[in-house]
């Protein structure tokens, strides 16, 4: 399950950081609903796997996924009041820790706001792994979120 969660983190963050500027309301609501559905389904699956010894790993990966998906929705919906309200309402039904969620929001805001985004690439990071500085930042970001998820 932790491998599927890591793959979901890559896919979700990649698509939520694409700068949709025309209709952020519809897209942010769709991604928020997608994160809520995934959050609910993984919660059910993790409860059935509590007897296994690696349930802690899957639970930590699930917290990282929840934080990243909701943070991506909030960052994407920051241009619209409807999207941000939906994202915050869905956060109340999530199981991720608020500190981890806030950390993911700040990391996403840093990547989307302060780092330069080339026009020929659709997203600020995860498509820029061939550049050394972004590879280092991606590695540090994922390492931080994994360690934070294991200790929360």
Curated annotation (Swiss-Prot):
Superkingdom classification of source: Eukaryota
Keyword hit for Cell membrane: yes
Localization terms from the record: Cell membrane; Secreted, Cell wall
Subcellular location, principal: membrane
Topological category with respect to the lipid bilayer: Multi-pass membrane protein
Alphabetic keyword roster: Cell cycle, Cell membrane, Cell wall, Cell wall biogenesis/degradation, Membrane, Secreted, Transmembrane, Transmembrane helix
GO cellular component annotations of the record: cytosol; extracellular region; plasma membrane
Transmembrane parts of this sequence: 26-46, 56-76, 82-102, 106-126, 127-147
GO biological process: cell wall organization; intracellular monoatomic ion homeostasis; pheromone-dependent signal transduction involved in conjugation with cellular fusion
Described purpose of this protein according to its UniProt entry: Involved in maintaining an adequate ionic strength homeostasis of the cellular aqueous environment, necessary for normal growth rate. Required for survival upon exposure to K1 killer toxin and hence plays a role in cell wall glucan synthesis. Required for dithiothreitol (DTT) resistance. Involved in cell cycle progression.
Name by which UniProt lists this protein: Protein FYV5
Origin species: Saccharomyces cerevisiae (strain ATCC 204508 / S288c) (Baker's yeast)
Taxonomic placement: Eukaryota, Fungi, Dikarya, Ascomycota, Saccharomycotina
